[in-house]
Amino acid sequence: MPTRQNNVLGHTNSRKPYHTKNHVEKTDTLIYALGGLGEVGKNMYCYEHENEICIVDCGVLFPGDELLGVDYVIPDYHHLIRMNKKRKFLVITHGHEDHIGGIPFLLKQVQIDAIYAPRFAKALIQKKLSEHKGLENTKIIEINEDSRVSTRYFTVGFFNTIHSIPDSLGVLITTPNGTIVHTGDFKFDLTPVGTNADYQKMAHIGVLKPDLLMSDSTNSGVEDFSISEK
């Protein structure tokens, strides 16, 4: 059943997390989405290894007419609440609402050790948090394509991508069990506004043969080319 909170709808999921094995080993790296799969919005992806969880994005979904009176839908954070003893850090790929809109609601329920965001997204998040009592002074660490985040089990690097908003990043996540490329939202634009995509870095990542690609697929079924931002 969905739960309503101040015109925000939180989706609950009674199904157990899906695993390809009958049981989970302590040394396994778990990957799961709390939103964003099969829908446009509510993007939130988790990469978990032992006592650490790397969260990528935390957005909202803008509902259709079937949810009259609901401003937006947020992911179900109950799994992260249950895992509150584990260390968690949040990485933001860009500043669209479907990737940052759920952050205030997450911070009110889940302990997050650090938030990393590119410059423009950082400014948008700070403005958003200033409207929520108790979250005004939340520290956000600015990142760019040259940044690196290292914890006990994760090493996270970044590369520039092109999107319809400035400062959009893709993410390279190295875990004890392999390497993951998380693209974030992207498109190929040969005449972009601002910084171009890191095609050379993308090619180098391909040479490294990552184990898993978590790719944006919005409008991938539409023929022809994307319109340039310029």
Where are these regions (language model features)?
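N-terminal acidic, proline/glycine-rich, low-complexity intrinsically disordered segments
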Residues: 1-9
